[in-house]
Amino acid sequence: MKTDIILAGVGGQGILSIAAALGSAALNNNLYMKQAETHGMSQRGGDVQSFMRISDKPIFSDLIAKGTADIILSVEPMEALRYLPYLKKGGYVVTNATPFINIPNYPEVETLMATLKALPHQVIIDADSIAKEAAGNVRASNFVMMGAGSPFIEIPFEYLEKGIMAIFERK
């Protein structure tokens, strides 16, 4: 078993919380895990991404080469497109349908969504609405997205749930 995941979004959307929960879930399931993250201008709504590699065999690099990612899990639709060159043929894009329009030249939303919907393996959900309805707060949309991506990540649900709980134990 080996799953290469690219987590993508913008600052404040909880990408690093997803990474922490997935990492905890993998380790508690006796899997190997390597992770690299970039969050330079994240506090100003900039790009945040994490490369996460999970395997039942030792992993020697935390980087994911272009064309090799099994899944792009994105909390923001434009960020899903940004990392498309990393997706392998047959890989899945799992993204939130709600854009975070924080730049003046943000692409036209209809064009963006049409491009995503044209992909052969995609799951597009309105995570913000689901989070607001289920948890009472759109800030939970990151974990809604993690749940949407869970069928493509070979970690049992109970470990994912424990991974989320581990993040919030100290809060």
Language model: regions and residue ranges:
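Active-site cofactor/cluster-binding pocket
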Residues: 1-171
